[in-house]
């Protein structure tokens, strides 16, 4: 059975960038949190998992469930 890993947006501690992570691995880097969230939302929708957005301090800012929205705009 395939494990479903949520998609996380978090600050990169080594650079002034935002990264999108899934399953403990970085899948993309972005200059703004907004662009990272847009990319993460697409990835979460495709994988039917939750999107968790963290602030620069590491705390969770928002949590979106995209499990049932794979085919929506």
List each model region and its residues.
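Histidine-centered active-site/metal-ligand motif
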Residues: 8, 30, 54
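A short amphipathic beta-strand at an alpha->beta junction
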Residues: 47-58
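Surface loops and adjacent helix of pleckstrin homology
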Residues: 23, 32, 56, 65
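A sequence-level detector of short linear motifs
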Residues: 28-29, 62
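A short, polar/proline- and glycine-enriched secondary-structure boundary/capping micro-motif
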Residues: 29-32, 72-73
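A cross-kingdom feature marking charged/low-complexity
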Residues: 1-3, 59-73
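A short, charged, amphipathic alpha-helix used as a generic interaction element across diverse proteins
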Residues: 31-47
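Short aromatic-glycine-(Arg/Gly/Cys) micro-motifs in beta-strand/loop hairpins
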Residues: 2-26
């Amino acid at each position: 059975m395939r494990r479903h890993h949520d998609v996380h947006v978090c600050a990169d501690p080594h650079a002034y960038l935002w990264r999108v992570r899934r399953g403990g691995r970085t899948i993309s880097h972005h200059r703004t949190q907004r662009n990272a969230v847009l990319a993460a939302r697409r990835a979460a929708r495709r994988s039917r998992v939750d999107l968790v957005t963290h602030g620069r301090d590491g705390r969770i800012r928002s949590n979106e469930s995209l499990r049932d929205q794979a085919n929506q705009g």
